[in-house]
Swiss-Prot record:
Recorded family membership: Belongs to the MCD family. Mastoparan subfamily.
Function: Antimicrobial and mast cell degranulating peptide with chemotactic activity for leukocytes. Is active against both Gram-negative and -positive bacteria (Staphylococcus aureus (MIC=2 uM), Mycobacterium abscessus subsp. massiliense, S.aureus (EC(50)=1.83 uM), Escherichia coli (MIC=5 uM), Pseudomonas aeruginosa (MIC=38 uM), Bacillus cereus (MIC=5 uM), and the multidrug-resistant bacterium A.baumannii), and fungi (Candida albicans (EC(50)=12.9 uM, EC(90)=15.3 uM) and Cryptococcus neoformans (EC(50)=11 uM, EC(90)=22.7 uM)). Inhibits biofilm formation of A.baumannii and Staphylococcus spp.
UniProt tissue specificity: Expressed by the venom gland.
In-chain residues carrying the UniProt-annotated modification Leucine amide: 14
One GO BP: defense response to fungus
UniProt lineage: Eukaryota, Metazoa, Ecdysozoa, Arthropoda, Hexapoda
Protein name: Polybia-MP-II
Keywords of this entry: Amidation, Antibiotic, Antimicrobial, Chemotaxis, Fungicide, G-protein coupled receptor impairing toxin, Immunity, Innate immunity, Mast cell degranulation, Membrane, Myotoxin, Secreted, Target cell membrane, Target membrane, Toxin
Location within or outside the cell: Secreted; Target cell membrane
Other notes: The primary structure of this mature peptide is identical to that of Polybia-MPII from Pseudopolybia vespiceps testacea (AC P0DQT3).
Length: 14
């Protein structure tokens, strides 16, 4: 799992 990309996706979804 790419946590940096996942984190960015979560932030963009907020």
């Amino acid at each position: 799992i790419n946590w940096l990309k996942l984190g960015k996706m979560v932030i963009d979804a907020l």
